[in-house]
Amino acid sequence: MTEAAATILRPRTTEALAGIVAQGRRLEVIGGGTKRGIGRVAGAQSVLSTSALNQVIDYAPEELVLTAQAGVRLADLEVLVAAQGQMLPFEPPHLTQLLRTKGQPTLGGVLAANLSGPRRIRAGAARDHFLGAEAVTGRGEIVKSGGRVVKNVTGYDLCKLLAGSWGTLGVLTQVSLKVLPAARAELTLLYFGLSDAQAGQAMTQALNAPVDVSAAAHVPTATAARAPLKAAMAVTALRLEGFAASVAARAEHLAAALNGLGRCEQLDAGHSRDFWVQIREVEAFSKDPRPLWRISVPPAVGWRVGETIPGDVLYDWGGGLVWLLSDADPAQVRGVVRTLGGYATCYRGDAPAFAPLDGSLAALSARVKAAFDPKGVLNPGRMGAI
């Protein structure tokens, strides 16, 4: 990045932000700056931050809808909705310790990265709760889902496209989200000493049972021994949430169904919440210097990642999300994951964060990029060729 890019531009209105983008300078787009290390922005001339767009526009708890500017801090939103007995359903991770950053993640940043926590397997991904958006395209045009139609982007689902685009298609300035009532009670069942394959089968069985498991994770022995878990053997965890009587009945049903797995312990609500924060934030891997990979795979084959690639792993989403610490060659990591039908993103390390897209997907991405940002001014190079 050039010396000029050291200046961080913090517009206070969407119109001012659009004016900056319309100038055509190449921009590194950030919210709280906590994920700047994921992907490498090449040739940016300035840094554009949404941190000054930090107001809650409207919150109607009775309608389960919240509208806020993109620069609102995620932690502040969580406090706001919790005071009304509600929650962000997709349980967004902060990842500041894992990524070794000092900033505060923002609502826009979490949605731009489409980051979801353990509850994704029950409630859906971040993009599934993204009801509306206002954004500025690379042309400097202000667009809204369900609002003004701009001919160059007509026909696109704005929310679905911007979620996971890492700021390469448009700069989110305002979003509307669905919120849900927070669970009245929760508990977590713990099983010990299972292999990765056994845990994968157990999590699949639990998720297919009529008990509404809201989170399922497996921490192998080598990972469980790390702080903060410090467990002597592998831990497989299954969370249940809801009304107290329902949670208790479902826990009894699930424990009976998994009786063959051996000793089962229960974490009460407080300890359960602490445990899932550790899983959500991948705290066991925060201090290890090795390259870190975030791998999405079909849950039924997730355990094969740890079996095939040397390193330490942690499984979330019933095996569908695998965090991997490994010095293995990036080509090996991506090759194994590709054969499993998944995708690997390098969150820490020297490898490119995002793998190049193949054939028709690359062509489609190029067409979408051309529609939203034809001159490539937004986060150039962050997602590779996109």
Question: What are the functions of these language-model segments?
Answer:
Residues 112, 131-289:
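C-terminal substrate-binding/cap subdomain adjacent to the FAD-binding core in PCMH-type
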Residues 2-29, 50-103, 111, 115-148, ...:
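N-terminal glycine-rich flavin-associated loop
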Residues 16-17, 76-77, 196-201, 245-252, ...:
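Short, conserved charged micro-motifs
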Residues 24-27, 81, 258, 337, ...:
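A generic structural signal for well-ordered alpha-helical segments
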Residues 29-35:
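Glycine-rich beta-strand-to-loop/alpha-helix junction loops that act as flexible
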Residues 31, 238, 324:
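Residue-level signal for inorganic ion chemistry
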Residues 41-44, 51, 261-386:
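Conserved glycine-rich FAD pyrophosphate-binding loop
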Residues 36-42, 228-229:
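Short glycine-biased active-site loop of nucleotidyltransferases that positions the nucleotide triphosphate
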